[in-house]
Regions:
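C-terminal and inter-domain tail/linker signature
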Residues: 2-162
Length: 162
């Protein structure tokens, strides 16, 4: 099946007009679909800040956020991005919102990943919002257990709002 020159030109124009953030989003989606932890972490800045839906204080730094993502990848079942929104957020950083669906045990999760990028397209801030609350609770408990098992946090630390 061939495409018309107009369609090919439009595709080339949209590809040429893509921003570093657009390219990072495409790489993130591909890495998530492939379950490629290293490729996901390679998209983060060294000083990345990750805001959890269940923890008050953010996770900070590449090593910590990378370890968290290893646990998240084992915890989420049937994770898939189902939408990609663009718009403006306060501040100058380029940003995107990715809508996702997943499961933790028998809990269905609806969520969004809010990403802010640096000028080179690396992810500087990653904020997750999920619903319903029962799914957030199940996710919190499973992730905390995974972080303890991986030695990222001590078992005595509370899994609650810190």
């Amino acid at each position: 099946m061939s495409t018309s020159p107009a369609v090919e030109t439009q595709a080339a124009d949209s590809s040429a007009a893509s921003t570093p953030a657009d390219r990072t989003v495409a790489r993130l989606r591909a890495a998530v679909e492939q379950g490629d932890h290293a490729a996901i972490v390679a998209l983060f800045r060294d000083d990345i800040v990750f805001h959890s839906p269940v923890k008050f204080r953010p996770f900070e730094g590449l090593a910590t956020v990378g370890a968290l993502f290893a646990v998240l990848m084992r915890t989420f079942e049937d994770f898939r991005y189902v939408g990609d929104l663009t718009g403006d957020l306060e501040g100058d950083a380029d940003s995107r919102v990715l809508v996702f669906r997943a499961r933790v045990g028998d809990k269905q999760i609806h969520g969004v990943d809010m990403l802010q990028f640096d000028d080179e397209g690396r992810i500087a801030t990653f904020t997750v919002m999920i619903r319903p609350q029962s799914a957030a609770t199940a996710l919190s408990e499973a992730v905390f257990a995974g972080l303890v098992a991986d030695g990222v946090v001590p078992a005595a630390q509370s899994g609650g709002q810190q």
